[in-house]
Amino acid sequence: MEVTEIWRSEGEVLVAGRPWDSPEVAAEVEALGGPGARLVRDEGAERFDVLPLLVATDGAIASFGHDSRRLWPNLVIGGVEGMAEREWPGSCLRIGKVLIGVQDLRLRCIMTSYDPDTQVQDSAITQGIYRRFEGKLALNCFVLEGGEIAVGDEVQRVRGRACAGVAE
């Protein structure tokens, strides 16, 4: 079974060309994952790991030295030198009318080791993040004031009353 071949056809999720909830796929998932392993449908709106928003900066991505897609950011902020983002936890980012709280640095997991094009794993990537960045790269964030963000919007780092409730 090619686990990476997951797509939708007419609204149905397929695994290797078969319906995700078919007995054949269930048997293969259990064979790969062990007794009791199964796929489940999740219709929830939230699809995130730690917090709803993962922000990276171009400076940190350049320091990382690999394809930025390995970090899985929702938002990349340009014009940031080096690892300046490491000083941002506890503050907020104002992007147009949007206000984003910066909670903390993201502790990276094994997903960074997978090439986004080939899905080939290179554990040296994740090991390098732990060695060079204490395992943390990019920012766990959440939206305080919603709205639309567009490419080219100015980003301002904000502290104080506007960021009440953001842990330092």
Mark where each language-model region is.
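Metal-cofactor-dependent catalytic cores
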Residues: 1-168
